[in-house]
Amino acid sequence: DIDCLVIVKLHHAQKKLERGFFTCASYKEYTEKSQALLKTGVIDQASLDGARIEKYVIGPVFNLNFFYSPLSEEGEKLELLGVDWRFESSLDGHVRLPAPQQMTMPLHQQIPEMTVVGHNTATIRESLLEKAFELGEKFIQASKEHYDPGIIGPFCLQTCIDKDMNYYIYDVAPRLGGGTNVHVNVGHPYGNATWRKPMSSGRRIAMELRMAAEQDRLLEVLT
């Protein structure tokens, strides 16, 4: 039963590795949109049959780019290097149009696609930082319990923050996040503050490997 706004997650039928996501707020809307997307070839029946339906959290989306160091003897083992957000096509183009214009578009243009085409850097208000670290620490602990030796180095928690300032994690990247490339030249805002110099994710990985080699502890950071 669909009794609130949801997002239906499945693969795009024609674009490899891209999304065929769509939103709906009722079973009737689910049926109408899925049939329209099937007709236009955006999705296929096999993917629709295995689609995942999640509650859609209304709020801004932030990717939290963390780094976990098992080598750290002093200070914090978990670092928040930076935050980014996404540009999605054709969704971002749709939201710049007045609602009446969206309603008069041809059927094949009315349902936006959510293909990530870029990223930009962001910050979050200070009162939300403590909770962000709590999420990162919980993820590290869970990864150790279920996938020994757990997460090492960079990882990304993809979150949404609602109107009551609650975080919702809708996906994770147990690796270098795609949005970190916006910080290659100038570093991450939070990483720069921690290390007092431009600190991109790539530089932080290089530092960790150098420290591990100098301490003869490479096996602790490599799997």
Predicted regions and their residues:
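Active-site nucleotide/adenylate-binding loops and adjacent lid/helix of ATP-dependent enzymes
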Residues: 1-59, 67-85, 125-138
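A short glycine-rich, hydrophobically flanked beta-strand micro-motif that places a catalytic Asp/Glu
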Residues: 54, 65, 147-164
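A short beta-strand motif that forms the metal-chelation/ATP-contact edge
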Residues: 7-9, 65-66, 165-176
